[in-house]
């Protein structure tokens, strides 16, 4: 197989989300969350998620049943559920399971990939032009260009992400982590709001917010209890790419 053969990205379809949120949360790791704007593409690799299981999950917004606020989570799979929390930021979720059955996945952290300067600006973070560290490999196929390098054995890439080799790299990673490490941060970086995005299809080719698979291979996944919640806090429903520096919060043991 040609090692420079393009890796084709594919838009995730509704069937991907039409299953148990735990399976979806794990499978989303390594995929790209993409926002199309008039000023260009914003994209981040999904590195951390949490599953919410519906009416049997005390921490889920659907635990007490269907309301006008949470109705998206009872609808078809693959739709954005956005809520406002703590009076200062939005959180993005995607609906799972068949229409009428509640369930969803929260996006907790992204590794910035494309449009980093624009995302930083949206977050109020100043990054000098030309000083942004580039990923060792950017999933350009997912953004409308040809990707390079594929695995001769599988056709899937397994790059761990940003290469950290010097102290200066650690400082840059620390700065970039402020862009989209955490559910509120990633929503602000991708300009996600409830008014703009709640109820939006993430599986439509016409949507300006979508999730694509660019054949990135996740090597190892860590599973822990969810964080930042009081109810059902010990259930192991948080998933993240092991060793990725953009994961938010501390890693509690399952």
Residue ranges with predicted function:
Residues 152-153, 160-161, 165-168:
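N-terminal polybasic/positive-inside topogenic patches
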Residues 2-143, 147, 164-254:
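Conserved, well-structured core segments that form or line functional sites
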